[in-house]
Amino acid sequence: MRTRQTARAAILSTLVVVAGAARASDLFNVNLAETGNPGNRLFVGSSSLPNLLENLADQTGAFASFNGVPFAANLTYAGIDNAIAIQYDPTGGANGGEVIRITSLLGSDATPTFDRANGDLGNQIRDFFLKDDPDAIKDFLKQVNRRSLVAVTDGNPLATTARSARYKFERFGIHTDFTTTEGELYNRFSVDHSARRARSPGANGGETPGAERAPLDNLPVHQAATPIRTRFHFAAQYIDAQSFDGYSFDLNTSFEYVFSEHVSAVLGFPVGYHAVEDADVFNGGVHIDVPVRFIIPDYGSPYGLTWQVTPGVSMDLSGSVDYAAGGVLWSGGVNNTFIFHLDRLRIVTSQQLTLHEGQKLKINDYEFDPGVSQQILKLGAKAAYSLTHKLEVYGGVTYTDFLKDSAIDHYWSPTAGFSFVFRNGANITVGYEGDFADDFERHGGRVGVTLPF
């Protein structure tokens, strides 16, 4: 008899382990045990925290077998074990009715109690996370950002802070040269550098050439562009973070007005969407930046230096009902970029610091407060080589460091591809982009289009 009981216990333990492994990739998991009978257990996973908690409180769906049964439950949130602890008592409420309590909430002292006498338990616990106590959820999300590799607003390459900093860095830093200035077009298309090199000192017995500041005979002049530059950048990437899979899409649009060769103003609208284990996250933003080029190459020279400094501000927002997370972030920062023009070779180095602060977001009855206060440092370099006047190849890498507490301290982002430059200032780029950190990888492609209007 004892042997059979031991065998049954072993089988039950095996099933529990298998069930847990089967749910390991779910973003949110509940480990449930009957009060006073810990052998009666249940594991349930979901891609939506509000739906999971609502079904748990009402004992519906996958929790139907625990209807009317007292239990204690621990919830894993986006890879964080025991982020939420819950107790249910079918007779502990007012007039002997049902009651459910949150006994532990990561980062918060809140221990709310939901009584059947006040309405449906599932609706009450759902509303707690989505709108009723934004201060408690703010403290909770602060800790999530510091521990989860796939948090919504901060602490990883998918987060709102990282997306905001990345837009600015790519647009005005490592890929700023994809928006070609008038002087760069002139030097690229309207000066015969091969003839110039042939007449350089040493090529003709030490003869010194005259100033080369106008197109040479029979050379087509580049087409002058309007003061408007419109730029689109689309990226699609696959996500592998810890035990989670997903995908992300970004479409960044910017409109630049060129006041002179030295000063422009840019209005940007980055938007993004990503899904992790079917949990949806939406991002958007409005950026205002002013690139100032203190140094530009001389007209007619294949060599020179561009020094550009770009201060800017932005409002970024994100939202995910599945995560019960999101909010509005204000940010400001400055990018410093040097471009070394070395005939066919172009080297870009860029440094950037941005500050990000959270602001409460209210949509209808829902309230989100991201609880974010972050600083992000980005350092990057890229080399581009012109195979022909219009075709070039490029490759580079960016280092990103979250200067305040975060789940991912830093990560690397390589990029490589081709760029097609046209005489009127239009540009098309196709390439690879990735992000690499401990237990986090993202791979994908980018397509960029710059239009001279």
Residue ranges and their predicted role:
Residues 25-143:
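Long, solvent-exposed N-terminal ectodomains/accessory regions
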Residues 302-400:
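Detector for outer-membrane/organellar transmembrane beta-barrel domains
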Residues 236-240, 255-257, 271-277, 294-296, ...:
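Transmembrane beta-strands of outer-membrane beta-barrel pores
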